[in-house]
Amino acid sequence: MIELISPAYILIAAAILIGLTQGYLRTAIVLGAPLLTLVAIWLVPDGVVTTFSFLGYQIEPLEGSPLRRLFATIFATMVFGGGLYAFRQARWYELSAAYAYAAGAVGVSFAGDLITFFLYWEFMALFSTIVVWCGGTPGARAAGIRYAIMHLLGGIILKVGILGVVISTGSVDVRPMLATDFSTWMILIGLLINAAAPPVSAWLSDAYPEASPTGSVFLSAFTTKTAVLALIMLFPGEPVLIGVGLYMVVYGIIYALLENDARRILAYSIINQVGFMVCAVGIGTQMALNGAAAHAFAHIIYKALLFMSAGAVIYRTGKGKCTELGGLFRTMPLTAVCGIIGALAISGFPLTSGFTTKTMISQAAADQSLVTVYFLLAAASAGVFLHAGIKFPWFVFFQRDSGLRPKDAPWNMSAAMVLFSGLCLLIGIFPQLLYNFLP
């Protein structure tokens, strides 16, 4: 019977129970619910699993496929890693909001109709805003309001597009489409807002660094990657996405190189990396779409690892600007090593997950004789190495001695970082483990 229930419900139940329990029972829920969700995800068969009629439309809240399962798997894995990282430091209401936020991402993954898709999409927007507010500072409250306004706008645009498509086609099915009329353009724009595409990329770099060190780990994973999943399902091969993706790649690099705040560097880097995925969706071949999915999978792991590393530094020192840090390798060696592994992965270094997945996108561009795209992506990879591969770890852990002598990360934060470091290396050394599950 469990395969007839959306795995998102498990995380919704966990979000409620986290607020009703405490102590060891709460810890068991925080760590156990994602694992149970992971089991439920792999019990969902391919095809439409549950369906019912609503206002004459066929609602399909649970539809399985290899692509959907791949994204839901990494979302559940991220919840476990994030929960392990946060359960001793985060307040209960932040954990509850983060788990509800993740439930929305899992729900989007399995939504077979546009109505269910939209409901989970807005569910995500609501609880991700709360996660930002849980930063607890005036800056977090202001950034959360701006974040909410931007996602409210994106939700309205998406809703207008969905209504237009439903009225014109009579169908609510999640199916591939091209941006050829007003309604489909509205859907595409709504999705791209969540992907932090230009000209509205600033909401991401504005909000994520204002969240708590634990909250930013969750924020790094879900919103932009559900947008990538939606683009793969709804707009594969949409030509405009190639240009949009390339712009995001360059935009993220330039602003990351100019930034001083460690988490804001990583936030701009998210925009850069999602640009690779958006460009791959625009190329639209099987290799490109698999590359986008695989890179999203790998990106969630190494980006969360980088935010974990930065968050541990902020938790121990209270400082987040690169110019205030330096020399922390002496007293935070584990955090430094894990941060370096994440930096190597995002830079596409051989034997790391980033190399395994980023090369698929470059190869897809080469296969289609997109020479300019290929060389721009190659140049962008070098730029990523400068800001995330060198700038972040060098200024934080090496460079000059800041005089700070903090302890290394608490054991639960360290365990989460070691887990995700291992996954970065495992996928890089044994890429077939990921390739076997690509759609």
Model-derived segments and their meaning:
Residues 50-56, 360-364, 433-439:
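Membrane-interfacial helical/loop segments at transmembrane boundaries in membrane proteins
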Residues 414-436:
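Glycine- and aromatic-enriched alpha-helical transmembrane segments of multi-pass membrane proteins
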Residues 81-96, 102-117, 127-412, 423, ...:
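Hydrophobic transmembrane alpha-helices and their helix-loop junctions in integral membrane proteins
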